[in-house]
Amino acid sequence: MTDHPGEMLSDYVHIARHYQRSIRVDADLGRLDALTGYICHSTATSILENMARQVTETNQRCFTWTGPFGGGKSSLAVAFASALHPDRNLRTHARNVLRLGSMPDFDKAFPNRKGWLVVPVVGKRSSVISELNAALRKAKGKGKDSRAVSPSSLINELCQTAEDREYDGVLVILDEMGKFLEASAMEHGDDVYFFQQLAEAAARANGKLVVVGVLHQSFAQYGARLGTDTRDDWAKVQGRYVDLPFVAASDEVVELIGRAIVAGRRPPWMHEASTAIADSIRSRDRKSVV
């Protein structure tokens, strides 16, 4: 509704273009414009801080980020990977976006002089080994190879690459990891034990091989229809990954919406009303925590 008959809401506001497209880690990594408008809210910051602390203080190197569709997990994955990217300009921009200057543990966990080799994979209901191998070859500038690769040889190559002096380390991003798990549960993909092998190898790689899987639901839920013994096996695999919930608080969502909406004209009372609403939401959140 507007103050002038005949005018539409679209005459006043529109959605910023960079908020109208979904992020795809394999296509958007390496692009400066993929970070345009990104907001690193407290939830995202806490995830990075948690990971940095785990990598610094323990031998944990594999993580899952679990949260609802459209929650910003892929965007954070691109920003995080960009902060480790060999491209210095991209790396600097991503670090500023993520405000890593105020996160001292990050540089301890992910030392970055030459850049990390980032291996972005988008999940599908097929072989994770095949897709990860293809992504690794592409990241290293190699051509496609249709020959099958064994789990052990793929993991060995990841570890050897992580030790290569050309890079500071290897970061594997498994976006839509749940699709690989679904394939495993339906016996259309690889044995879920591969994820355990990968995690165990990463734990022995002196912090130079880090794996992040992006999920929409808990690891166990993907295997909920399996038999009891098989579910127990899945639980053992899940135990190798530290799960970090990715659920933005309501005030963070409001801020994101506020950034996404572009208003050409604003009524004089708008700022005061917006501030009152934001304060009310923050107050409600504090009470719910208490």
PLM-predicted stretches and their roles:
Residues 81-116, 143-153, 223:
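Flexible phosphate/Mg2+-sensing switch loops adjacent to catalytic phosphate-binding sites
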Residues 108-127, 200-290:
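Conserved P-loop NTPase catalytic core
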Residues 162-191, 214:
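Conserved P-loop NTPase "ATPase switch" module shared by AAA+ and STAND
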